[in-house]
Amino acid sequence: SIQTVFFGFLIATAVAVPLGIVSGLSPTANAAINPLVQVFKPVSPLAWLPIVTMVVSALYAGGEGGMSKSFLISAVTVTLCSLWPTLINTALGVASIDKDLVNVSRVLKLSPWKKITRLVLPSALPLIFTGLRLSLGVGWMVLIAAEMLSQNPGLGKFVWDEFQNGSSDSLARIMVAVLTIGIIGFLLDRVMYALQSLFTFSGKR
């Protein structure tokens, strides 16, 4: 489960951060991207899952040693549901940069790449990390439901199998799994918080 959620989370981060930077820097891009975010952000993972399943099934060409289809379905579903908090917070962080700093970058005639790496990212990093923490939490929650329905090996599939089993011990096993899910979710958030504190000047906000 942890492997799957990190795979989906990394893809979501790779998509959301660049889009958020573009959206934060350009009002025109924001006007185009923001409506799409508001349309797709509320969509339930249960709605995404059939679409993802059909697309992955049509394109899947895995073999021995490759990623399983159920793994890809779960990971892509995590990506689609978890990228929005990071995208929104990145755009907000970039758009909130001190205007004086922006003016200084213009006076110094910084190239777009230097402007992003030396001004935009350092200034927006606290909000970016806030988005990453939210995204990882959403991804972990979504993953459990995705594993149940896609039958990808993990905690979600374990809970579903025990529910289907219906033996006298199933309830106890499900409760242990639920506690495990909660504890892992808490630990994942603590890891992201530690990284936020390490790499930003306002990690305690």
Q: Which residue ranges define each predicted feature?
A:
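Transmembrane alpha-helix signature in integral membrane proteins
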Residues: 1-22
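Generic hydrophobic transmembrane alpha-helix motif, especially the helices
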Residues: 38-85, 92-93
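Non-cytoplasmic
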Residues: 131-186
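Hydrophobic alpha-helical segments of integral membrane proteins
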Residues: 1-2, 25, 29-40, 101, ...
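Hydrophobic alpha-helical transmembrane segments
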Residues: 6, 10, 75-76, 174-179
